[in-house]
Amino acid sequence: PEKSSENESYSLRAQSQAVPVTRVAFIGTGASASASEMVINGQLPFLGAATALIGSNTYGKPVGQIARDRSVCDDRFRIVAFRVENASRQGDYYTGLASKMASTCQAADDIGRPLGDPAEASMRAGLDFLAGRACTPISGQSARSGANRGLLRPTKPSAAQYQLEGLF
């Protein structure tokens, strides 16, 4: 039998106490994947150009896995078992979401500032988008490529951070 016969769809109804959303800024990096991308992609059919990806392109993982153990030889298989789509049946973002978004704003991942600090580059770009101000789009090359792997480093490391890589 076809596995597609086991597909399930879930629809959410509007709630009377819901706040009407006018614009949403999603902050992401090359390390944003899977569930984060699922949330962003799920909003595109409903909010369209009122959403923006802030930061850099996402990882590009519109699939999920299941684990299957083989006790005979102590192996574990990670099987790609499902692909995620939104209400418009869009789900081919294997190179990240930047090329699928109507609006993007390039910003550095400023790990030297506290989460939520309006002076942090990604937060500032997100607030600018929400206020209707212009921003620099995520560049074409970074919009097409997946995650850039590498150690996160502060822009201006302290003496201790310089000596001990990975210290925050």
What is each model feature region?
Residues 1-168:
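C-terminal "post-core" interaction segments
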